[in-house]
């Protein structure tokens, strides 16, 4: 049964990507992604809203009711009150994806109609608690852009192709499938766009297997957490792994994230809705996490998962006020201007609760470089905040082949020790990238859970040793011995084989000499 479902899922993904590739024409897929993802989202929220009303009326006894067939006036009067408070937005029947796609091919005002619909959906939340969660959601879905074509008819043709393409995808009955098929399709598209985009794609999507590992690590030994936070959330893939891995009652107060890039910020919010996370259970903000943190009032967080940009530039000590910032001041040094890695780490530590855990993907150089980075490492080690350092295989991420490292932070450690795990061999080779398999993830989590020495796999090291003997070097290779996989040679056996070979050679020489002597006599 599982194999059949997996085959069906792969076929659905193949069709979705074929449609996305076909409708973009000569436009670069990366530049076109917001239209495919945005229209898929539009279809989802339309079907979600229609199903919301249909289900309620059917349960009340009106089995013939269809929200999509109502007049806008009836819907406005009978269904809008209370809906925005519950769902966060409202869509009139005429604005539903189903009704728009019916005459999309003949609609000479399609691009303007869609722009007005998207604007109306956003405006429906004005004055309600969901206003900030909906505001600007469709900003990147510009139906007037020349990306779609140079003339209005060309724009309308491209938009009609997208609408009909998305409409042709069979997600099954919405009531039965709910959001699973939509959410899965959205994640698949994001992953493919990221993979094809290379380096730029890696900025907004963390591969699902790495996301799954981080989600597992932060929950080891925990039955529930208050909320989960990603300070550089991209498209929200890391946050959503927490939802996929754990039941709702385990994550009590929802999902929080911040993202500096506008497109990624909108993708993350759409991603939340597509995975059935209601507006009142997530809070995604836009802005520079280091210079304009948006969740100071919501901290602390029991779980933080993050894959911040590697060694990007920031203002650092160019802003003299930052050394007094509560997030950075405790270490006594700011991260270097050319490498903001430890600024993100200190930010996460500041937002972490006393019983929480953070798992952060890092560039490996930060664990051994000197200067300010060494000073910050010393602060983390001396205050016993480093729970584990885990080296990952290379080529796991889109756009970079470097072998990254996971830094695990906690504030409630019982021992002044740090666990180092060498997971560099835990992968399966695929066409373009290495991937973590389910068994790889289980093995890494098991090593972390057991928190002990395992030959060639993990080393539990006293913090005093890290400081006094290793000068606060946190590289895994410093502590976990590499297994010598060369064939071991038994000298005694080798000497015996050599002696036997020499004896054979001597015997053969004697035989040859005898033959030569006989030949000489024959002459």
Report residues per predicted region:
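Conserved, well-folded catalytic cores of nucleic-acid-processing
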Residues: 22, 165, 169, 188, ...
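Conserved NTP-handling cores and scaffolds of large molecular machines
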Residues: 27, 43, 49, 189, ...
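Conserved S-adenosyl-L-methionine
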Residues: 200-306, 311-313, 317-322, 327-332, ...
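A structure-centric signal for secondary-structure junctions around beta-strands
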Residues: 36, 182, 225, 252, ...
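A conserved structural/catalytic subdomain of Rossmann-like adenosyl-cofactor enzymes
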Residues: 2-3, 7, 298-523
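Non-catalytic, mostly N-terminal accessory regions of nucleic-acid modification and defense proteins
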Residues: 1-213, 217-218, 280-289, 391-395, ...
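Glycine-rich, flexible loop segments associated with nucleotide phosphate handling
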Residues: 114, 181, 228, 336-338
């Amino acid at each position: 049964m599982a194999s059949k479902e997996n085959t069906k899922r792969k076929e659905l993904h193949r069709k979705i990507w074929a449609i996305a590739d076909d409708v973009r024409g000569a436009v670069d897929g990366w530049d076109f992604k917001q239209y495919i993802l945005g229209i898929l989202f539009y279809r989802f929220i339309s079907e979600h809203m229609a199903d919301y009303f249909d289900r309620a009326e059917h349960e009340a006894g009106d089995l013939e009711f269809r929200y999509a067939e109502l007049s806008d006036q009836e819907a406005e009067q009978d269904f809008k009150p209370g809906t925005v408070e519950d769902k966060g937005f409202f869509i009139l029947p005429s604005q539903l994806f189903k009704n728009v796609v019916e005459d999309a091919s003949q609609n000479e005002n399609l691009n303007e109609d869609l722009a007005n619909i998207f604007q109306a959906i956003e405006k429906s939340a004005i004055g309600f608690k969901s206003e900030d969660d909906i505001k600007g959601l469709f900003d990147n879905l510009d139906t007037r852009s020349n990306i779609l074509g140079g003339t209005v008819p060309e724009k309308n043709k491209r938009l009609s192709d997208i609408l009909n393409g998305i409409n042709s995808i069979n997600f099954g009955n919405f009531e039965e499938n709910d959001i699973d098929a939509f959410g899965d399709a959205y994640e698949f598209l994001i992953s493919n766009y990221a993979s094809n985009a290379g380096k730029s794609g890696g900025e907004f999507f963390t591969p699902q297997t790495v996301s799954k590992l981080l989600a597992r690590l932060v929950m080891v030994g925990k039955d529930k957490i208050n909320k989960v936070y990603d300070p550089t959330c991209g498209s929200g893939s890391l946050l959503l792994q927490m939802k996929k891995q754990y039941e709702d009652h385990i994550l009590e107060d929802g999902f929080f994230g911040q993202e500096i890039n506008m497109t990624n910020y909108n993708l993350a919010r759409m991603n939340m809705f597509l995975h059935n996370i209601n507006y009142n259970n997530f809070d995604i903000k836009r802005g520079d996490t280091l210079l304009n943190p948006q969740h100071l009032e919501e901290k602390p967080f029991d779980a933080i998962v993050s894959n911040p940009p590697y060694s990007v530039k920031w203002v650092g000590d160019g802003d003299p006020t930052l050394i007094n910032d509560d997030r950075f001041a405790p270490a006594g040094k700011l991260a270097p201007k050319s490498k903001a890695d430890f600024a993100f780490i200190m930010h996460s530590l500041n937002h972490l609760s006393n019983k929480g855990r953070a798992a952060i993907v890092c560039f490996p150089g930060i664990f051994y470089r000197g200067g300010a980075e060494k000073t910050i490492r010393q602060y983390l080690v001396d205050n016993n905040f480093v729970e584990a350092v885990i080296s990952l295989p290379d080529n796991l991420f889109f756009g970079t082949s470097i072998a990254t490292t996971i830094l695990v932070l906690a504030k409630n450690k019982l021992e002044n020790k740090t666990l180092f795990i060498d997971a560099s061999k835990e992968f399966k080779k695929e066409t373009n990238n290495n991937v973590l398999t389910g068994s790889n993830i289980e093995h890494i989590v098991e090593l972390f859970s057991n928190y002990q020495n395992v030959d060639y796999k993990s080393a539990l090291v006293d913090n005093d040793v890290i400081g006094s003997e290793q000068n606060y070097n946190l590289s895994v290779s410093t502590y976990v011995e590499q297994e010598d996989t060369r064939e071991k040679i038994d000298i005694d056996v080798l000497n015996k084989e050599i002696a036997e070979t020499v004896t054979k050679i001597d015997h053969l020489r004697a035989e040859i000499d005898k033959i030569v002597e006989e030949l000489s006599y024959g002459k």
